[in-house]
Amino acid sequence: PELIPADEAGNIKQKTEDLVGPYELHDFFIYHFLRHGFTPQRLFIMARHAFASPQQRAKHYSDDEIKHWLRVFLRRFFAQQFKRSCLPDGPKVGSVSLSPRGDWRMPSDATAKMWLDECDKL
C-alpha cells in the first residue's frame, strides 16, 4: 500500500500498519511464538505486561487492542504459510528464521482454528 501514490498534500493514503496492526506488537508476537512456542494465552499475558504501562518507553496497548491484533497476527500467519513454502533463501536475523530451507517447518495447509479459538477465550 505504501506504493500507492501520495495525495495532493504529499501524505501517504494508505499505510500497511493501519491494516495489519502495530509492527511492534507483531514483532513481539512472532518472536515469542516462533522462538519459545508460546500459546495465544501466554502471548497475550506477556504482551499485556510488556505494553501495559503508559510510563514505560513502549507504547501502551489495552487488553482489547492486544487481543484484536493477536487474532489478526495468528490468522494472517497461518493463512500466509503457503507463500513461505515457495520462497527463495533469505537472511536469518537473530535466532529465528522463517525460511523453509532453514529452521521453519510448517505445512502450507495448516489451520489457525485452534489458536484463534484460544484467542476467543481470552
Can you describe what each PLM-predicted range is?
Residues 1-122:
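ATP/NTP-dependent adenylation/nucleotidyl-transfer catalytic domains that generate, transfer
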